[in-house]
């Protein structure tokens, strides 16, 4: 096993390493969302190198990090992180609103995101939400709930990761693929039993069973026979 205790550089951000590895062969260490949050793990590269990652606890691997460099054979071990895309909601424009408007908008946005069971992290006047459904569906949720005045965009998760602390990264990416998927897109003018769009994924419960459901009524569920956990 090859022990990796330090990151040499980043081929995507560091011009020196970009030039050095211009004609090099990349032996990729491919990490998924959960693995990317760990400062310690053991995994093989695409060319079969047995790598033991043992970094300082505050260090998080980033896409393009160079972990090893065999100059003689012109081969570099480089990290490739496969993260979900992220919706970035810019809250900066709320600074110009009245305190009442700011509080109301933030409360309603939090309620809308929570109603979809979407994970979120707020940082630098932005809200980061990992994609669990199609971007068109997330776009519809934002616009239907009246947040079209808040600029939002979709970016690669790897662009957001360096800005996050370990705990924030775990919250945003750790197990995002296991989140229950709820999409409710209703017009404010819809009747209680109107034709608004409802998409529900399967819910897993602690008692080992699961169920799926779709309906044309409001999102107000009562289950008397068991707790409804997410």
UniProtKB/Swiss-Prot annotation:
Gene3D superfamilies according to UniProt: Urease metallochaperone UreE, N-terminal domain (2.60.260.20)
GO molecular function: nickel cation binding; unfolded protein binding
Coiled-coil ranges from the UniProt annotation: none
The organism's place on the tree of life at top rank: Bacteria
Keyword set includes Cytoplasm: yes
InterPro entries named in the record: UreE (IPR012406), UreE_N (IPR004029), UreE_N_sf (IPR036118)
Biological process annotations from GO: protein folding
Annotated stretches, region: Disordered: 182-230
Function: Involved in urease metallocenter assembly. Binds nickel. Probably functions as a nickel donor during metallocenter assembly.
Entry similarity comment: Belongs to the UreE family.
NCBIfam families: PRK13262.1
Name this polypeptide is given: Urease accessory protein UreE
Organism: Yersinia mollaretii
Lineage: Bacteria, Pseudomonadati, Pseudomonadota, Gammaproteobacteria, Enterobacterales
Gene: ureE
């Amino acid at each position: 096993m090859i022990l990796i205790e330090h990151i040499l550089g980043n081929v995507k951000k560091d011009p020196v390493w970009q030039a050095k590895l211009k004609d090099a062969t990349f032996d990729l260490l491919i990490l998924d969302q959960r693995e990317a949050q760990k400062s310690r793990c053991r995994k093989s590269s695409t060319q079969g190198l047995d790598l033991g990652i043992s970094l300082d606890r505050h260090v998080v691997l980033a896409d393009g990090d160079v972990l090893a460099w065999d100059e003689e054979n012109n081969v570099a071990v480089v990290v490739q992180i496969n993260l979900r895309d992220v919706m970035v909601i810019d809250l900066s424009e709320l600074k110009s609103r009245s305190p009442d408007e700011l509080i109301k908008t933030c409360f309603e946005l939090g309620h809308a995101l929570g109603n979809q069971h979407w994970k979120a992290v707020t940082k630098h006047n932005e809200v980061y939400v990992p994609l669990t459904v199609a971007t068109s569906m997330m776009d519809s949720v934002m616009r239907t709930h009246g947040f079209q005045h808040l600029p939002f965009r979709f970016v690669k998760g790897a662009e957001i990761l360096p800005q996050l602390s370990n705990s924030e990264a775990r919250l945003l990416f750790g197990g995002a693929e296991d989140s229950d998927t709820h999409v409710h897109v209703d017009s404010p003018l819809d009747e209680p039993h109107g034709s608004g769009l409802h998409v529900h994924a399967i819910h897993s419960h602690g008692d080992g069973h699961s169920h799926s459901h779709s309906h044309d009524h409001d999102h107000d569920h009562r289950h008397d026979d068991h707790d409804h956990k997410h």
